[in-house]
Amino acid sequence: MLAGCAGEEKDLFDKSAAERLNETGKIYTARLQSSEAGWVMEYYPTNSDEEYKGRGYVILADFDKDESVTLAMNNVMSDDVYMEGRSLWEIIADNGPVLTFNTYNEVLHCFSNPEYYESGKGFEGDYEFVMIDVPEDGEFIMLKGKKRGTYVRLTRLPAGTNFEEYLADIKAFHNGIFPASAVNENVLQVGDKKYSINNANSGMLGMYPHGGDAITETTTHPFLITKRDGKYYLRFRSAIEVDDETSEQEFVYDEANDRFIGTTNEANYIEGEDPVHFFYTVFGSDAHRWQWTRTSEMSESQKAALDEVAAGFRALTNLSLRLVGENVVMRVQYRNSRNQNASVDFIFNVTEEADGITLKYDKPVLDAGANVLPANPALATYLETMSQKFTVTAGSSRFNMNTLRLTAASDSNNWIIVTYY
């Protein structure tokens, strides 16, 4: 005779699922409140590549113990001025702990308001977030949009942080390192893959294989700039993946070397284009030029030489290196003895080398150039002194090389800043 299994399986938990969720909610609430100054929220409305729906927005959040929250931002959604909003928040149980902003907050709810975008759906952003990772005393908390599934990272702010000053700081850094007026593309290296990048000022970085086709191969990668421990960080919405084992999502700015380096692998980086190559590529068309004047930054020897050249004219307007026809010329623009604008061109051969540019003076263009030289011997001397090798470095930052510094390879005390036009 077989005995029946009358005993019941022992309950693995002392409390019900609802009770456990409620306790977890209390713990997570306390952890959000534990940051005295609040948190940096890296908010992305959707995973779209559309400019406003897919780009990132830095929102600062201070969760108070009275169940109110102060949110702040300074971006295109606030008309690029500082804006604060105050509302209520709580952590609710919904198949797991969910952070909800349950009364209207103009800082966050504008991303879900259908009136804010011409599609009639708004930016389709979330205002409820599944709490994915909320470690005790953690520097970071990871959330996930309940509807759109975009990941939102919270970073603890140091005590005493002023919201308005913090937002102004990172905005100024972003616009300074990636100005809308930047004249050159930049470079991103992850693993053995190198990419050209552009449009970084918008926060919707365009990326294509270095040397590839910018029109057909560009992909879009939204990112945000934040700051912690006195350093600026650039973090993409999604990691840049080269293969299953090689990726990088976040980079920290290395001020000494003017580049961003990967936080997981310092061999990964973002930096400006090579100054030598950028200087040379301007001569690929006649659309742009490198120009300088007597008021440009320069060494004492350069200033003395240009002062002598200027003394031979009624006024020296500017000098430039540019493509004219099939030749690179140094154009000298001046005011003649009749106070008329005039210019003369002198052909230079330009050679790009790994460590610099070599300029070699050839001859004047047409008789006008030849006729000016006897009347202004200082100009003839200047042409010869510019006929040498120069190292080329960024005037201020490789991320925006609207100015470059040419330094004589044979004399580091002979240099001049030239400007991109």
Q: Which residue stretches match the model-derived regions?
A:
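A short, polar/proline- and glycine-enriched secondary-structure boundary/capping micro-motif
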Residues: 80-85, 109-115, 152-155, 272-273, ...
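C-terminal motif of bacterial Sec signal peptides marking the signal peptidase cleavage site
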Residues: 2-4
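Hydrophobic/aromatic beta-strand elements that line small-molecule binding cavities or substrate pockets
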Residues: 57-63, 87-90, 126-133, 221-223, ...
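Short solvent-exposed strand/turn elements
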Residues: 97-115
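A recognition module on extended beta-rich or small alphabeta surfaces enriched in W/G with H and D/E
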Residues: 117-138
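Short, hydrophobic/aromatic-rich segments at coil-to-beta transitions
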Residues: 34-42, 66-70, 96-99, 139-142, ...
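Acidic/polar, low-complexity intrinsically disordered N-terminal segments immediately downstream
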Residues: 6-98, 134-136, 142, 148-150, ...
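Preference for solvent-exposed, low-hydrophobicity sequence contexts
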Residues: 157-405, 412-421
